[in-house]
Curated annotation (Swiss-Prot):
Catalytic reaction annotation: L-methionyl-tRNA(fMet) + (6R)-10-formyltetrahydrofolate = N-formyl-L-methionyl-tRNA(fMet) + (6S)-5,6,7,8-tetrahydrofolate + H(+)
Taxonomic placement: Bacteria, Pseudomonadati, Pseudomonadota, Alphaproteobacteria, Hyphomicrobiales
A Gene Ontology molecular function term of the record: methionyl-tRNA formyltransferase activity
Binding site for (6S)-5,6,7,8-tetrahydrofolate: S112, L113, L114, P115
Matches recorded under InterPro entries: Fmt, Formyl_trans_C, Formyl_transf_N, Formyl_transf_N_sf, Formyl_transferase-like_C_sf, GART_AS, Met-tRNA-FMT_C, Met-tRNA-FMT_N
EC number(s) from the headed UniProt entry: 2.1.2.9
Keywords: Protein biosynthesis, Transferase
Name assigned to this protein: Methionyl-tRNA formyltransferase
GO cellular component terms, A-Z: cytosol
Role, per record: Attaches a formyl group to the free amino group of methionyl-tRNA(fMet). The formyl group appears to play a dual role in the initiator identity of N-formylmethionyl-tRNA by promoting its recognition by IF2 and preventing the misappropriation of this tRNA by the elongation apparatus.
Species for this entry: Allorhizobium ampelinum (strain ATCC BAA-846 / DSM 112012 / S4) (Agrobacterium vitis (strain S4))
Cited CDD domains: FMT_core_Met-tRNA-FMT_N, Met_tRNA_FMT_C
Keyword Nucleus: no
Length: 320
């Protein structure tokens, strides 16, 4: 037997989970995704979401309502007569009519160990906070923001230099395995639910643009966590004076560095390997990217953009 299923998701993160459920033989009667968005320099082209594109490759019908305020959209959802809806990074809070619009309800794949990091940016926030462990949880959705009871948990270790991009990929794959297992148990009538604890609630708010500018006045551990938590998107950055022109440089990866001289101004370049003094300690910039350029390792970057020891990056003075 297989479940009659609706899948709801939008970004690349959700695609492996859609694929896994399809390969598991479930009858996916509809895929819901965010509407196509303007793309290109002039915004004249409309780009379908990664889930939308993959669903079409699989031959699945796709619906892209802006929201579910219209009764017609709610009726269309109910008309699928689905057993269950699987929701993974769809991008909308679902109204009661959708949460109760299938026989068994809506199950969500969320990229954190709830109740820590409820909300929009759990992967980035976990790394930026210096967490050493996170995970993927399958929960039954209710009206709250990631507050529903948990059905299944898979844990992942966050290594010291792991970026948000690397963690994203790991959780996406583990999430696919977890969701297939959860749906098999649900189909068998053996998927117990456990209420989330009331203590330990932390919200993963969206990343603000102001957070992406590196503040070297922070301790090196926090600078390092910010860099890897914002990599590859939206990217942590600083400004440097290159041949008399202030240029924005994105840092895609870094490492903690050992320093003996702790009296340097934060933001000071300490050597020819792009070791940068911080408020406490130092970080080494490993991979960088200029605006409009390609990502480069530090040595290759310095060959085209010489930055000497003693340079003080402008972002250290920004107070952000």
């Amino acid at each position: 037997m297989a479940l009659r299923m609706i899948f709801m998701g939008t970004p690349e993160f959700s695609v492996p989970i859609l694929n896994a459920l399809f390969d598991a033989g479930h009858q996916i009667v509809a895929v819901y995704s965010q509407p196509p968005r303007p793309a290109g320099r002039r915004g004249l082209d409309l780009t379908k979401s990664p889930v939308h594109q993959q669903a079409e490759k699989l031959g699945l019908p796709v619906l892209t309502p802006l929201n579910f305020k219209a009764q017609d959209d709610r009726d269309a959802f109910a008309a699928h007569q689905a057993d269950v809806a699987v929701v993974v990074a769809y991008g909308l809070l679902l109204p009661e009519a959708i949460l109760t619009g299938t026989r068994l309800g809506c199950y969500n794949g969320h990229a954190s160990l709830l109740p820590r990091w409820r909300g929009a940016a759990p992967i980035q926030r976990a790394i930026m906070a210096g967490d050493v462990q996170t995970g993927m949880m399958v929960m039954k959705m209710d009206k709250g923001l990631d507050t529903g009871p948990v059905a299944l948990t898979r844990r992942v270790t966050i290594t010291p230099d792991m970026t948000a991009g690397e963690l994203h990929d790991a959780l996406s794959q583990i999430g696919a395995e977890a969701m297939v297992e959860a749906m098999a148990k649900l189909e068998a009538g053996d998927l117990p639910l456990t209420a989330q604890p009331e203590d330990g609630v932390v919200y993963a708010t969206k990343i603000d643009k102001a957070e992406t500018r590196i503040n070297f006045s922070k301790p090196a551990t926090q600078v390092h966590n910010d860099i890897r938590g914002l990599s590859p998107f939206p990217g942590a950055w600083f400004e440097a004076d290159i041949n008399g022109k202030l240029e924005r440089i994105k840092v895609l990866s870094s490492q903690m560095a050992e320093v003996t001289d702790t009296a340097n101004v934060p933001g000071t370049v300490l050597d020819d390997a792009l070791t940068i003094a911080c408020g406490l300690g130092a970080v080494r910039l490993v991979r960088l990217q200029k605006a409009g350029g390609k990502p480069l390792d530090a040595a290759e970057f310095l060959r085209g953009t010489p930055i000497g020891a003693g340079t003080v990056f402008a972002s250290a003075k920004a107070g952000t």
